[in-house]
C-alpha cells in the first residue's frame, strides 16, 4: 500500500445493489464497447442506451472523447496514459454500477490487459464486453473525425491501428461486425444479449 493510503479508510455504504434493484427494477451492468476508431462504438452505445432507456432502465454513457474533456484531460496518448485512461474509466464505471446504473462505455481500449483489469472490478454477470469489429480499411474510409488522415500525415503519432497496436478481444461476450450489420440490427443483437444475460442472473426490468 502506498504511504498516502495508510491513513485512508474505506467507508461502506448503507445502500446495496439489492436496494437499487428493488427501486430501479433492473440489475446494474457495464456494457463495454471496444474497437478501432471509426468502428461504430459510440454510435452503437448511444443507440443502445436509447433502447434501454425506453425499456425503463437507468442508464449512462461513458464516452472516450467526452471523458478526455474533463476527468482525463491531463492524459495524452502514450501507452502509459492510455492505460491510466482505461483504469480511471473502470473505476468510474464501478461507481455507477454500485448505484444500480446500466453503464455503456465506448472506448478503443486497445490493450487486452487493461480490459481484463476493468472486468476484474465487477461480478461476472455485471460485465459485458462487446467487440465492435470492423477492418482497418473500412474504419479508415469512414474516418468521421479525420483522425486517420492526420495519423497518415504524421500529425497524430501513436494512433491505434496505424502506428500503435490494437489487441483484439480474446473472449468477448459479443462480437458485432459493423462491416456487415447496420445500426438497427446491431442494437437489436446487443439488447437481446443484455436481456439474456440479465435473465440468467436476474431481471433486466421489473416486468421483463
From Swiss-Prot:
Protein family (similarity comment): Belongs to the APS kinase family.
InterPro entries cross-referenced by the UniProt entry: APS_kinase, P-loop_NTPase
Catalytic activities: adenosine 5'-phosphosulfate + ATP = 3'-phosphoadenylyl sulfate + ADP + H(+)
Keywords, ordered alphabetically: ATP-binding, Kinase, Nucleotide-binding, Phosphoprotein, Transferase
Residue sites binding ATP per the record: 35-42
Catalytic residue positions: 109
Pathways involved: Sulfur metabolism; hydrogen sulfide biosynthesis; sulfite from sulfate: step 2/3
MF terms (GO), sorted A to Z: adenylylsulfate kinase activity; ATP binding
Biological process according to GO: hydrogen sulfide biosynthetic process; sulfate assimilation
Enzyme class at the top of the EC tree: transferase
Protein name: Adenylyl-sulfate kinase
Pfam families: APS_kinase (PF01583)
Signal peptide range in chain numbering: none
Highest taxon listed in the record's lineage: Bacteria
Assigned EC number: 2.7.1.25
